[in-house]
From Swiss-Prot:
Organism of origin: Marinomonas sp. (strain MWYL1)
Phylogenetic placement of the source organism: Bacteria, Pseudomonadati, Pseudomonadota, Gammaproteobacteria, Oceanospirillales
A Pfam family per the record: FlgI
PANTHER family to which the protein is assigned, alphabetical: FLAGELLAR P-RING PERIPLASMIC PROTEIN FLGI, FLAGELLAR P-RING PROTEIN
Protein name: Flagellar P-ring protein
A GO MF label: structural molecule activity
Keyword terms, alphabetized: Bacterial flagellum, Periplasm, Signal
Length: 362
């Protein structure tokens, strides 16, 4: 029986978690942009398309070079493939700079190995052309056909890359050099971390320089001169900021069976039955003793928890006081439960309010 891979994460207190500001936040207006396009890959060794739109694109390409085919002539070529193009345009990219291009087959081509992308445009979401792509593909996948019609494929031979295959042709407008403020946006919104960033900047530059807008954004006064602004931002993004602890969270990967449990996950008394398994979490209030005061002492009652897991086979597992979610997962593993059983139990406990953590299934 496949066992669950369990990882328990223990986070340090936020007072000792110092991160650079550039690692936990980004500057508003400084961002990448996605580009897309359509093109033809030629030079394939019989592994191209046989689709109608590829033939139409091929005929259109020939006509641009002054080649006109007679009516009724089929322009099908197994050495040509229609492809989609994607690329990421970094912030502040300037005309003439190079970016990588990812090329993916659209039709029924079996492989793009050895192909060359013809000159194609890359557009942004606004429809404007921002880059021009062309070049030889680097394909990591491998495909092979046997004489009897058999076929084997390794990795993905229908997707390739062209390193530095596109030339930037247009600048994306940016608000970085406008106004007299900068705004930092945290990658993971958190009120405590936002306050820590604000306090750190104000302690360095003076009161009122930074203002917390919400759990994500911190607005900072900045010089208008572009060169001074770059120096100013360089200082700020290298500040060490104390990062708050994350919320209690359980992450479950339903495909691999991996469960990641944060440090602050608590389990309350509950009982759940799933298939052949019964999980019982109970709280027992034992008497601990006296506090040792002069007045004779006061009885202190401290709650403790225990877990029982009973499969139909008659086995029962009783745990020491101080039950944790880690104990539950390990116990269910011991009776040979499938990954789906553990995930169903966790989801049931979450719905019943017995787990005070976010349950994230990926």
């Amino acid at each position: 029986m496949k066992h669950i891979a369990l990882i328990v994460l223990y986070f340090l207190s936020f007072s000792v978690q110092a991160e650079r500001l550039k690692d936990i936040a980004s500057v508003q207006g400084v961002r990448e942009n996605q580009l897309f396009g359509y093109g033809l890959v030629i030079g394939l060794n019989g592994t191209g398309d046989s689709t109608a739109f590829t033939n139409q694109s091929f005929v259109s390409m020939l006509s641009r070079f002054g080649v006109t085919l007679p009516e009724g002539v089929n322009a099908t070529s197994k050495n040509v493939a229609a492809v989609s193009l994607t690329a990421t345009l970094p912030a502040f990219s300037k005309p003439g700079q190079k970016i990588d291009v990812t090329v993916s087959s659209i039709g029924n081509a079996s492989a793009l190995r050895g192909g060359t992308l013809l000159l194609s445009t890359l557009k942004g979401a606004d429809g404007a052309v921002y880059a021009i792509a062309q070049g030889n593909l680097v394909v990591g996948g491998l495909g092979a056909n046997g004489a009897d019609g058999s076929r084997t494929t390794g990795n993905v031979p229908t997707v390739g890359r062209i390193p530095n295959g596109a030339s930037v042709e247009r600048i994306v407008p940016s608000s970085f050099n406008t106004g007299d403020t900068l705004t930092f946006n945290l990658n993971r919104p958190d009120f405590t971390t936002a306050k820590q960033v604000t306090d750190k900047i104000n302690n360095l530059l003076g009161p009122g320089v930074a203002t917390t807008l919400d759990a994500t954004s911190i607005r900072v006064s900045a010089p208008r001169d572009s060169s001074q602004r770059v120096t100013y931002l360089s200082i700020l993004e290298n500040l060490d900021v104390e990062v708050a602890e994350e919320r209690a969270r359980i992450v479950v990967n339903s495909r691999t069976g991996t469960i990641i449990i944060g440090q602050h996950v608590k389990v309350s008394p509950a009982a759940i039955t799933h298939g052949s398994l019964t999980v019982t979490i109970k709280e027992v209030p034992p008497v601990v003793g006296k506090d040792g005061t002069i007045t004779g002492g006061q009885t202190i009652v401290s709650p403790r928890e225990g877990i029982e897991i009973a499969p139909n086979s008659g086995h029962m597992f009783v745990f020491d006081p101080g039950a944790s979610l880690d104990d539950i997962v390990r116990a269910v593993n011991q009776v040979g439960a499938a990954p789906g059983d553990v995930m169903a139990i966790l989801e049931g406990l979450k719905q019943a309010g017995a787990i005070n953590a976010d349950l994230v299934v990926i």
